[in-house]
C-alpha cells in the first residue's frame, strides 16, 4: 500500500515551497514535518512502496568497493530529516556560490554538478533544481540501478526540470569515466553509513575527485572519523582516525593508504568498564 500524501498530485509549486522551507529550517523537527508529505507524494508519482510488508532487499548490488543499496533502501534514506536538511542547505549554498562565481567570470557558464548515487528520487538535489535556471546549473546524474534512474526520469519530466540535466548515466560510480573534456564544479555523493563502513563513499570520492575542476568541491567536503574512550563520567578524545576530503581522496587514488592508519596513546584510567566510542562528523560545505 502506498503512503498517503496530502497532495492530490505533487506539482512544481509545492516542490519549490518545500525547498524554500527546508532551506529555512533550523532543526530536524521542522524538517520532518516538511519532508513527510513531499516524500509520500514522490512515492505516489513513481509508484514506489517505501515500506513493503515483505522486504528482502534483493535489489542491492555488491560491488568490489562496497554495497550499493537497493532503490527502496535509497528512498528510505530520505526519511532522515537532519540528513535531508543539512545536505540540502549545504548543497544549495555550494551551488549558489559557484553560480555567483560563474556570473562574474568573463565567459559565464552553467555550474556543472555530478550527483553520484541518486537513488530513485535524487532526493538531495531534486527539490533545488527549480530554484536554478538551466543557464545557471547543469547536472549529470549517476546511479548503478536502472530502476532508480527510470523513476528519477519520471520525476524530472513531471516537475519540468529535465532541462537542468546534461546527462543521465547508469553505471558504477567507482568505475565510470566521463567524456574527456568533462570537469565538474561540484561532485555530490552521500553513499555512506556511520564510520564509512559497507557502502562505497570512500571509493567513489577517491575515483571521482580527478574529474573536479581546479576550484571544484566535493559534497560533503569532509567526513571525519574519530575515536574516544568513555568511562564513569569521563570522556577522553583519542584523536582522528581518518578524514575523507578532496586532498585525502587524491592521495588514496595515488595508492597512499598510510592515511588509513592511526595510533593513539591510551590515558591512565581506573580499572573498570571502558567504552570505545567511534564518531563520524560530516562537513557538508564550509
Spell out what each predicted region is:
Residues 156:
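Conserved hydrophobic residues forming the short capping helix/wall of the S-adenosyl-L-methionine
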Residues 76-88, 117-124, 144-148, 197:
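Phosphate/oxyanion-binding active-site loops and adjacent basic polyanion-contact surfaces
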Residues 47-50:
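Short helix/strand-capping turn motifs
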Residues 60-100:
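Class I SAM-dependent methyltransferase Rossmann-like catalytic core
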Residues 2-14, 19, 26-44, 54-64, ...:
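Class I SAM-binding transferase module
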Residues 119-135:
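Conserved SAM-binding loop of SAM-dependent methyltransferases across substrates and taxa
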Residues 106-121:
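Conserved class I S-adenosyl-L-methionine
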Amino acid at each position: 500500500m502506498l503512503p498517503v500524501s496530502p497532495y492530490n498530485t505533487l506539482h512544481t509549486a509545492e516542490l519549490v515551497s518545500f525547498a524554500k522551507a527546508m532551506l529555512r529550517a533550523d532543526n530536524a523537527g521542522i524538517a520532518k514535518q516538511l519532508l513527510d508529505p513531499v516524500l509520500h507524494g514522490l512515492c505516489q508519482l513513481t509508484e514506489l512502496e517505501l515500506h513493503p510488508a515483505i522486504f528482502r532487499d534483493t535489489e542491492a548490488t555488491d560491488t568490489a568497493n562496497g554495497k550499493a543499496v537497493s532503490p527502496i533502501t535509497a528512498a528510505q534514506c530520505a526519511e532522515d530529516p537532519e540528513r535531508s536538511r543539512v545536505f540540502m542547505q549545504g548543497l544549495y549554498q555550494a551551488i549558489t556560490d559557484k553560480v555567483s562565481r560563474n556570473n562574474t567570470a568573463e565567459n559565464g557558464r552553467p555550474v556543472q554538478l555530478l550527483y553520484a548515487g541518486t537513488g530513485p528520487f535524487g532526493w538531495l538535489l531534486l527539490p533545488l533544481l527549480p530554484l536554478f535556471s538551466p543557464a545557471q546549473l547543469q547536472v549529470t546524474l549517476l546511479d548503478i540501478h536502472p530502476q532508480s534512474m527510470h523513476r528519477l526520469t519520471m520525476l524530472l519530466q513531471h516537475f519540468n526540470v529535465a532541462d537542468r540535466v546534461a546527462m543521465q548515466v547508469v553505471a558504477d560510480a567507482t568505475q565510470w569515466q566521463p567524456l574527456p573534456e568533462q570537469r565538474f564544479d561540484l561532485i555530490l555523493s552521500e553513499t555512506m553509513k556511520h564510520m564509512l563502513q559497507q557502502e562505497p563513499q570512500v571509493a567513489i570520492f577517491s575515483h571521482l575527485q580527478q574529474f573536479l575542476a581546479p576550484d571544484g568541491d566535493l559534497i560533503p567536503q569532509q567526513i571525519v572519523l574519530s575515536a574516544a574512550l568513555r568511562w564513569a563520567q569521563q570522556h577522553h578524545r583519542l584523536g582522528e582516525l581518518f578524514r575523507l576530503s578532496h586532498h585525502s581522496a587524491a592521495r588514496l587514488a595515488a595508492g597512499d593508504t598510510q592515511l588509513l592508519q592511526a595510533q593513539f596513546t591510551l590515558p591512565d584510567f581506573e580499572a573498570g568498564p571502558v567504552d570505545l566510542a567511534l564518531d563520524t562528523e560530516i562537513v557538508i560545505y564550509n
